[in-house]
């Protein structure tokens, strides 16, 4: 028995903030943002819309798409860095709202790599037989910690949530390999400043991302016994089109094997990879027996990569 994905779901706020909107708010331009990041627009949550609201909506859809009910869920794992409070956890809030009375809940925090950490954690519970059905959510409301006076970072971030239901699948499907890591010495390059707003040393983060995403991708390929050409789809953290293209080139993959949502969502941190995965499923980009590589990096500094063979 292995652990695989049984259903997916997402939620993004209604409000769209375009690059042209940002031109009216700060000294920037659509051309400058697009050429450097690939971002054209991002979603922004309402003031009264919180991370747990985003997570709840995505989880609800994922459970429905898996053909399950909240009573079938054993555990909720929510990857996020924008909890409204230290406790209760976002996972506990959505467990209550969904009426999933049989489930436990916990949050994991690995920034933009958080969803990969959540998926790998869920897989261990399933493979041991401890739990059967686990909901993993990546959700963040980055707009509340964005420094809107810093044009270098304000143009990057958006809000949203993506979710998957994980459960038992056959041995030759599901999670084939993973590589999680951290380099705490780089924590100073990406963190919250004294005003609890995002600070980023873009140059250092770029170097770290390109290096670690590339190396982690090669390691999970080797662990899974696969070659680069065996990959059917690459879903990287949607931070910046240049980093994403560097990941694709490191693997010698054609353009059509790179999943891109950065243009319409921006960088949504913990939900970035999850949202891209859900969009790939909804667009028919993933079919049974496809080998899908998820890879990301984040504040910490952290990285996570994994390969899933789609299907049961």
Swiss-Prot record:
Q: What is its EC number?
A: 2.3.1.180
Broad EC category: transferase
Cite the annotated pathway. Answer: Lipid metabolism; fatty acid biosynthesis
Q: Which GO terms describe its molecular function?
A: 3-oxoacyl-[acyl-carrier-protein] synthase activity; beta-ketoacyl-acyl-carrier-protein synthase III activity
A biological process from GO: fatty acid biosynthetic process
Q: What is the catalytic activity of this protein?
A: malonyl-[ACP] + acetyl-CoA + H(+) = 3-oxobutanoyl-[ACP] + CO2 + CoA
For this UniProt record, the keywords arranged alphabetically read as follows: Acyltransferase, Cytoplasm, Fatty acid biosynthesis, Fatty acid metabolism, Lipid biosynthesis, Lipid metabolism, Multifunctional enzyme, Transferase
Catalytic residue positions = 112, 237, 267
* Location within or outside the cell: Cytoplasm
Q: Which InterPro entries match?
A: ACP_syn_III_C, ACP_syn_III_N, FabH, Thiolase-like
GO CC terms in record: cytoplasm
Q: Keyword Lipid biosynthesis on this protein?
A: yes
Q: Looking at the record, which segments are called ACP-binding?
A: 238-242
The record, for Pfam families, names: ACP_syn_III, ACP_syn_III_C
Classify the main location.
cytoplasm
Recorded hits in HAMAP family, A to Z, give: FabH (MF_01815)
Oligomeric state and interaction partners are given as:
Homodimer.
Domain statement: The last Arg residue of the ACP-binding site is essential for the weak association between ACP/AcpP and FabH.
Query: What job does the chain carry out?
Result: Catalyzes the condensation reaction of fatty acid synthesis by the addition to an acyl acceptor of two carbons from malonyl-ACP. Catalyzes the first condensation reaction which initiates fatty acid synthesis and may therefore play a role in governing the total rate of fatty acid production. Possesses both acetoacetyl-ACP synthase and acetyl transacylase activities. Its substrate specificity determines the biosynthesis of branched-chain and/or straight-chain of fatty acids.
Regarding protein family, the annotation reads: Belongs to the thiolase-like superfamily. FabH family.
- Protein name stated in the entry: Beta-ketoacyl-[acyl-carrier-protein] synthase III
